Amino acid sequence: MDFALTNFGGIRVPLPAGEITLEDISSMFPFNNYMCYCRMTGASLQKLLEQLAATPAFQATSGATVRVKDHRLESALVGGEPIDPERTYHVTTIDFLLDGGDKVNVGALSEEVVLSPVLLRDVMLAYVQDCEARGELVSGKADGRVIML
């Protein structure tokens, strides 16, 4: 995947310090948001990022570094590179954002959409379990992917 997107409104409580339990993950992600895999052009991905910049609060993303000023996208990198309008990008999101949830419409910008039977909370639980199995800590530290001016 080149880019991932979910909505902050779907993340209901912060990640607790210490051991993370199934109850913690269920409280963080209480909605039945199903994972979706989309294919879109760079031109469409650019439009999506512009759409996100125009909203009151940018959503939770991974794989991109963006700079937004006055609700306008100033710059965007995906995988550390400028967006190529001709390239095909692979995007992961949730079904809520496919047709207008939180004023985001990933589906309309996609050339292909594949709905998954897997819930976002299950993906997060698997991630936490994988980190635990490797002896790694899960961090909720902000990493500067989105800069709002």
Residue spans of the language-model regions?
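Feature captures C-terminal
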Residues: 1-149
